[in-house]
Amino acid sequence: MMNIYEIAEDSFRINAYIPEYGLGFSQFLIRDEEPLLIHTGPRAMFPLVHEAVASLIDPSTLRWIGFSHFEADECGSLHEWQEAAPMATPVCSLVGKLVSVDDFAPKNPAKGMTDGEELTTGKHTFRFLQTPHVPHCWEAGLFHDTTTNTLYCSDLLHQNGDVEPLTSDSVTDRARQTMLEMEAGPLAGYLPYAVGTDTTLKRIAAEKPTTVATMHGSVYTGDGEKAILEYAAMLKEVCGA
């Protein structure tokens, strides 16, 4: 069952908790003149996500499908969404468009974004941040809704567990525990820590969002700059050299 929660004006977190994984998966729908879905979820979740989206908009009117990088929980049901919404166009980094997305889903070629480029969907404007290997993958990027000051941060601030949809409390301790669990198991190396990681995280923090919307875990509301800098320090401690 999908849980729907409005995290900002006309911006909805659509979440399913999967007990066997101990993990929640969130998609975000921005209801606007040109509706935008951030993350599709994997193919197996498509019927649930589609039903949830249908409770908020006519799903056939979906115009944009945004995602950080090429991975099943980010864009695995892209084909299904393009069948359900004929005008739905992927929006991702230019690198993602060139190296993966247009080959995978040629029906509607992706809008490839470069760093600082903006997409307007009606009332909302999204600034694209090119963030190679943050959270992971060469083509990674993030979307900042400058209208609501919401940063859609993909796997950053990842927290395991069945947690509340929105919190003003720090999520750093949860994120640290999650990273320690990941590093101790077969999924170690989930978030690579490279030469440019800290610089990229500081550049993301400089956006000063007031809402930070992670795919896995509670959305954080408050001083987003502080939250991301705390996360950056934690990541350096756990994963850095």
What are these regions (language model features)?
Residues 42-43, 72, 158, 219:
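Short, glycine/acidic-enriched loop or turn micro-motifs at the edges of active sites
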Residues 45-91:
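Active-site metal-binding motif and surrounding structural segment of the metallo-beta-lactamase
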Residues 13-19, 41-43, 67-69, 127-133, ...:
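Short, flexible loop segments at the rims of nucleotide/cofactor-binding pockets, characterized by
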Residues 6-9, 92-214, 218-223, 233-235, ...:
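Metallo-beta-lactamase
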